[in-house]
Amino acid sequence: MIVDNFKQIAEILPEAENPRDSMFLIQLVVRHKDGHLDAANGNNRNRTVRSYQINTVEELLNKEKEIKALCDFFRARAYININPKNTVEVLLKQMELIHQSLVCMWNGDHKVMLRGTLDGALARTGEDDVEFGDVDPQDLALIQTLAEKRHRTWVVDCDDISIVDDVRERINNSRRSIDKVIVAEIPTKSGLHFITYPFDHVTAFDGLEEKLEIKRNSYTLLYFNDEVEGYIE
């Protein structure tokens, strides 16, 4: 099975007026359940083998062949977080993490530290999700308006194909103040990722909580190919 979402992601990736103001994180991940018996890292059964930081759709498409080749070689999956990260905020967070490492008397490879602190800064920047400082989380209209303006999305992970239509209908019928809540539907190996703006998920998904996972500030699938040698069913 091959899942290639490059074209679809390129169509929804937000473009900043100044591309250097924002960046997006791509990770190539090997997973234990894909046949990587050595993928475990502590309690984490996944391992990142390569990361990319891109600023534009053009950069994404320029990296497409390279990313696909590396995924096929390592038997990895490529994931992308389509929530833009503010470049200045990322650099400030990285400086904070570097300072913490030095205070703790880091004595390892400094290249590893720089790479690790950048990945950590990218992962942690934007963790405020849709709360936006002093905005009352109950003010759904304001939250949705700000989310649409700032390109802040959720990933609704649905691994049960039999309920996809029901989930889509519930999201579309949810209480909202913007015209469209669903930004895109991204295929995965076992189901679908609904890329959405924030909505009243508690009411919308009543009775489906155990079948869905809502991921804020998270990744969606960019590329997957288990037709190369080495994958397990």
Feature names for model-found ranges:
Residues 191-197:
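Catalytic nucleophile-His microenvironment captured as a short glycine-rich beta-strand/loop
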Residues 1-188, 199, 205-207, 220-233:
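Signature for HUH/AEP ssDNA processing cores
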Residues 210-211:
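Polybasic, proline/glycine-rich intrinsically disordered low-complexity segments
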Residues 215-216:
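Short, cationic low-complexity segments
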